[in-house]
Amino acid sequence: MTEIFSDTGFRQLTQMFLAIIFFHTSEYILAIAIHGASKVTLSSLLISKHYALAMLISVLEYIAEIVFFPGLKQHWWISNFGLTMIILGEILRKTAIITAGRSFTHLIKIRREEHHKLVTEGVYQIMRHPSYSGFLIWSVGTQVMLCNPISAIAFAVVVWRFFAERIPYEEHYLKQFFGRQYVEYAQRVPSGVPFVN
């Protein structure tokens, strides 16, 4: 059990918790900066029961593996690759949020508001849903950084499936809001989530 307190355990778990704290805090701060404190609730922290359970399971996997298979956690090139994924996913997501400005919300809007505009510049020139792509990269990266093979696969599948269902739902409303303009945009720019058109 002392393996958890080894240099490896300390480094990887510290990086994991710092990544989680930074991600959620920055999401909340950006929401306040863009929309104003009066329009932002704690839901902008993006912490749900399912998410918390997934993170708990990943930590339990980490503890079990570092105790019974400590060598599994010593693959630094894998861990560093995961850390790189976390950073790149974070940059992509935050760039998407800042670029979209007031048009970005954590909840899918089903009614068009006055300030809504179709954002097609910046990172939106290369993908329609860069914030989703960024979160997918970030979330899988947390598990790759921990050298958690089971959770890395599970996170990839679950997060991908979530976005595979969310994107068509969201785009239904985007087509209503922006009509032909959005249809043409969607035809020439990929979603940013693999295998989701």
UniProtKB/Swiss-Prot annotation:
GO terms for cellular component: endoplasmic reticulum; endoplasmic reticulum membrane. GO terms for molecular function: protein C-terminal S-isoprenylcysteine carboxyl O-methyltransferase activity. PROSITE patterns: SAM_ICMT (PS51564). Its cofactor is Zn(2+). Inhibited by farnesylthioacetic acid (FTAA) and N-acetyl-S-trans, trans-farnesyl-l-cysteine (AFC). Its EC number is 2.1.1.100. It is an enzyme of class 2 (transferase). It is a multi-pass membrane protein. Substrate binds at residue 166. The chain crosses the membrane at residues 16-36, 52-72, 81-101, 140-160. S-adenosyl-L-methionine binds at residues 116-119, 124, 129-132, 170. It catalyses: [protein]-C-terminal S-[(2E,6E)-farnesyl]-L-cysteine + S-adenosyl-L-methionine = [protein]-C-terminal S-[(2E,6E)-farnesyl]-L-cysteine methyl ester + S-adenosyl-L-homocysteine. InterPro entries: ICMT_MeTrfase, PPMT_MeTrfase. Expressed in flowers, stems, leaves, roots and siliques. Detected in apices and vascular tissues of leaves and roots, in the stigma and in the filaments and anthers of stamen. Not found in petioles or hypocotyls. Induction: Not induced by abscisic acid or auxin. Divalent metal cations. Probably Zn(2+). Disruption phenotype: Plants lacking ICMTA and ICMTB have altered phyllotaxis, fasciated stems and development of axillary flowers. ICMTB is more widely expressed and has a higher catalytic activity than ICMTA. This is Protein-S-isoprenylcysteine O-methyltransferase B.
